[in-house]
């Protein structure tokens, strides 16, 4: 009897799907946060969770198995030196998928996938007090005064030209 496979096909052949997941995983390990479609993000989450769990073993055999899936030395180095240390006490759930607004061009469902322990809240900039309304640039007296001076000098130049003609 035929059984249904749980993985998404993503509209690709098997080799293309494998390469796509490997590339998305590499970028996630290097940059800790990537934006992609929701379906790709969910599949990448499955793929990366298994890789990180395997890497927590820390053996040479684990490195070789992971290198067969992700063929990028910088990503593997980052995984074993940095990421495994941060997630050592965590039992799964290394990534999070956050849904975003649909993409403008084709309305595809978008999402951000990120490593959980790397998402620090950005430090907020110090709050500045608003300037007094009279000091704001829009429609200020300074710009109006400057344009009046230019008009006066232009009319004075015309008057001088008229007197020279006489």
From Swiss-Prot:
Please list where the region (Disordered) is annotated. 122-166
This protein's source sits in the domain of life called Bacteria
Return the Basic and acidic residues bias intervals: 142-151
InterPro entries membership: Ribosomal_bL17, Ribosomal_bL17_CS, Ribosomal_bL17_sf
Cite the entry's keywords alphabetically: Ribonucleoprotein, Ribosomal protein
Q: Does the keyword Ribosomal protein apply?
A: yes
**What PROSITE patterns does its record include?**
RIBOSOMAL_L17
Q: Where is the composition biased (Low complexity)?
A: 152-166
Q: Name one GO cellular component term.
A: cytosolic large ribosomal subunit
Q: Name one GO molecular function term.
A: structural constituent of ribosome
Report if keyword Ribosomal protein is assigned. yes
**Disulfide links within the chain:** none
An individual GO BP term: translation
Q: Which HAMAP family match?
A: Ribosomal_bL17
Which family is it part of? Belongs to the bacterial ribosomal protein bL17 family.
- Can you state the subunit structure given in the record? Part of the 50S ribosomal subunit. Contacts protein L32.
Q: What is the official name of this protein in its record?
A: Large ribosomal subunit protein bL17
Q: Which organism is it from?
A: Chlorobium phaeobacteroides (strain BS1)
């Amino acid at each position: 009897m035929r059984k249904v496979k749980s993985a998404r096909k993503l509209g690709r052949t098997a080799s293309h799907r494998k390469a796509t997941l490997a590339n998305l995983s590499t970028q996630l390990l290097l940059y800790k946060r990537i934006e992609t479609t929701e379906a790709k993000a969910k599949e990448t989450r499955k793929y990366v969770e298994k890789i990180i769990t395997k890497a927590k073993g820390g053996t040479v055999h684990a490195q070789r198995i992971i290198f067969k899936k992700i063929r990028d030395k910088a990503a593997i180095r980052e995984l074993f030196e940095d990421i495994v240390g941060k997630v050592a006490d965590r039992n799964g759930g290394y990534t999070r998928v956050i849904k975003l607004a649909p993409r403008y061009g084709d309305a595809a469902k978008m999402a951000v996938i990120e490593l959980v322990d790397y998402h620090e809240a950005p430090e907020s900039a110090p709050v500045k007090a608003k300037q007094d309304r009279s000091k704001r640039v829009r429609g200020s007296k300074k710009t109006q005064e400057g344009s009046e001076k230019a008009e006066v000098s232009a009319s004075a130049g015309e008057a001088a030209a008229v007197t020279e003609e006489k």
